[in-house]
């Protein structure tokens, strides 16, 4: 029998099929959707602060709207909680009034509250309670400004596994709310069918803090799923208050550097106080530059 010519048409067609298969594997390996996960383009606001308008798109089956994400480095900024009664005020201010009063670079709503404006859960300021009792079900606790210098400067505690003593708190600032996504990647909210504007605080694997505000209504479960898929660097996340209380505001001096540009930044209308009606907020979290001493 005559030996086969390896360059014959039959062998060339087999070789061609293998080339196509390998090319397909290569395409899968550099799937654009995976590559999108994520080329986030951050705009620097100040030392330790950056911002972007994140577009989840078809990564989240178009169920989740674009969201403003503010990234904060706890080594360069500090966090402080506020409640209007602790400030000696008769009525809760709106977010812009909170910013003017405190001088914060960034102001964001905190967790949920009752009809009498009492905070629902743990709320600490400078190590003392300015909120209610520990909520028995909600397991998310945003903490900042540790008592001991060897602790991280800010982060999220999962109260289902992390210890936190109210008698001897390890952090001076704390706000309790609903856990969304834990450090094992487990979703901690159920699908409810209810939608609202949402505010989320997240913690990346490198310790940076994310403040996330959706630009439209979305369910918490859908948002949690989207964050897990679209932001793989996100280690854990918890929901703050939502609906009409969802608010994120930048100080005028941070926005001033973008004045005079031909077009406003795509995120600007959502954080300059012009894009929505602002209701009074009993409690807020402020972000401030950290002193040179790092205190």
What residue ranges belong to the model's regions?
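Active-site-adjacent helix-turn-beta-strand microarchitecture at beta-sheet edges
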Residues: 113-187, 192
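Catalytic metal-binding/acid-base residues of hydrolase active sites
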Residues: 112-113, 243-245
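Zymogen propeptides
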Residues: 34-135, 150, 212-213
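Short, solvent-exposed aromatic-acidic interface loops
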Residues: 84-87, 157-164, 214-217
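Conserved, well-ordered active-site substructure
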Residues: 117-136, 187-238, 245-295
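Active-site neighborhood of phospho(di)ester-bond hydrolases with catalytic His/Asp-centered motifs
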Residues: 107-109, 237-240
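N-terminal secretory signal peptides that target proteins for export/translocation
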Residues: 1-14
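Bacterial N-terminal signal peptides
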Residues: 18-29
